[in-house]
């Protein structure tokens, strides 16, 4: 990755300089606005600690949720400021706005080693504007917070696939560097994209075939096996002629799945049994059947135990594994066995077969934590679901491309 990194910035010296860091604190919150998964916050700490220890005046920005360009208390970064303070062991102030009077006053008042968190950048409609002039004006205002001799560090890997102001446009206005998280994520994904050790297995789950179509097309030539579970597997099974009853289905993608099976059928590995629910509810009645015994009027919420076994056999022989998307509705304990079983098979392959295993962010990373699995059992857990998929599809990531300038 031919870009300047945090090491380059630290070598230049940051003592007394304002450094704006774009992190990704788009974390899940419960109804009491408590953070339920601190993974992305923990991942941001190495860059922030390195800067504060070197005497920088650090200004951090992030989005949270989709407030649609309006101030909305529900999406305030207050819980993030609190969590950062706890994790860093130092007070992290939260500005009352993004580029308003409070943000400027607090930025001007920073001393060496201080951290200021701006309020949710998506409270300003210009953050996600399609109008380059609007984004440019917002970028000017953000850059102004850094005063003279400021710098920008891109460390929110989960957003580098978006050409948004705080990710892309601001990098045109300040000396720019890749933070440790972004640098590490890119190097891991480059290893998989450019030189994966065979056998290379891709595990795809999640709800929609349409979301993963690009990655199937891109990886079919490189991967030895593509395991498909989760909501997207039902469209493939339907394309094979199986009855999936009321399971999630993308009717408009059935012909596409038929085409993929015709072209890559020797690589695509599908479930051989399914776990069914009488309704979409965590306490629904549950049945496991083979593919030809679908219970009338039910819907499948997970793969079955024979499928886990089949997938585990493939994974156990693999040397490179990329996993993106759960195998079922893991949030419901009764329908979490498929995701747990496949995740454990990846952990086992990593330990016993020396596999290089990457969890591609998003719901997969969340499931590892929710199910209490050993995070250290994987070679790498990415913080970016969409970004990691787009990288492996060979797409240019705007937030990375702009750093190469």
From Swiss-Prot:
Pfam families: PGK (PF00162)
Domain of life: Bacteria
Catalysed reactions, as listed in the record: (2R)-3-phosphoglycerate + ATP = (2R)-3-phospho-glyceroyl phosphate + ADP
Chain positions recorded as ATP binding sites: 212, 331, 361-364
The keyword ATP-binding is assigned to this record: yes
SUPFAM superfamilies according to UniProt: Phosphoglycerate kinase
Signal peptide as annotated in the record: none
The keyword Cytoplasm belongs to this UniProt entry's keyword annotation: yes
GO terms, molecular function: ADP binding; ATP binding; phosphoglycerate kinase activity
Its EC number(s): 2.7.2.3
UniProt keyword list: ATP-binding, Cytoplasm, Glycolysis, Kinase, Nucleotide-binding, Transferase
InterPro entries: Phosphoglycerate_kinase, Phosphoglycerate_kinase_CS, Phosphoglycerate_kinase_N, Phosphoglycerate_kinase_sf
Pathway in which the depicted protein is active: Carbohydrate degradation; glycolysis; pyruvate from D-glyceraldehyde 3-phosphate: step 2/5
Enzyme class: transferase
GO cellular component, one term: cytosol
Subunit structure: Monomer.
Similarity annotation: Belongs to the phosphoglycerate kinase family.
The protein's name in its UniProt record: Phosphoglycerate kinase
Organism: Corynebacterium efficiens (strain DSM 44549 / YS-314 / AJ 12310 / JCM 11189 / NBRC 100395)
